[in-house]
Swiss-Prot record:
GO terms for molecular function: nickel cation binding; zinc ion binding. Pfam families: HypA. PROSITE patterns: HYPA (PS01249). The keyword Flavoprotein does not apply. GO terms for biological process: protein maturation; protein modification process. InterPro entries: Hydgase_Ni_incorp_HypA/HybF_CS (IPR020538), HypA/HybF (IPR000688). This is Hydrogenase maturation factor HypA. Zn(2+) binds at C73, C76, C110, C113. It comes from the Archaea. NCBIfam families: PRK03824.1. The gene is hypA. Ni(2+) binds at H2. Involved in the maturation of [NiFe] hydrogenases. Required for nickel insertion into the metal center of the hydrogenase. Signal peptide: none annotated.
Length: 139
């Protein structure tokens, strides 16, 4: 269900942009999926295609880019990637992080110094990184 809500927000944003720009056709949407969010791209794509039916975006190309999750310790400066520690997560933890990425601080610590004071440098959230439209008179 979470993926459908994300798809709805992406589609509405893309269609609003296309309308503001006077587009006759929405050709493509490029979406970045942060690894930390652990979103199922297949479900999002299916939902987006369904939501685009009957609109100027029907048949639009949908591209996903996965952005790797990277963390940086505020105490020692060490940087590490989610994939380096993800194996220690059980399904409950993965689900918690999926719905509320901020809880990652409760489950992770810097692998170098053990601090839980770290920032998410990249790989959090879902956002549109590109929209391609066709305006009147363009081919």
């Amino acid at each position: 269900m979470h993926e459908w809500a994300l798809a709805d927000g992406i589609v509405r944003t893309a269609l609003d942009y296309a309308q503001r720009e006077g587009a006759k056709k929405l050709l493509a949407i490029q979406v970045v999926l942060g690894e930390l969010q652990d979103v199922n791209a297949e479900i999002v794509e299916f939902a987006m295609k369904e939501l685009l039916k009957g609109t100027i975006g029907e048949g639009a190309e949908i591209e996903f880019i996965e952005e790797e999750a990277v963390f940086k310790c505020r105490d020692c400066g060490h940087e590490w990637k989610l994939k380096e520690v993800k194996g220690s997560f059980d399904e409950r933890i993965k689900e918690d992080i999926h719905f509320i990425p901020e809880v990652v601080h409760a489950f992770l610590a810097c692998p170098k110094c053990g601090s839980r004071d770290f920032e998410v440098v990249q790989g959090r959230g879902v956002y549109i990184s590109g929209i391609k439209i066709e305006k009147e008179g363009e081919a």
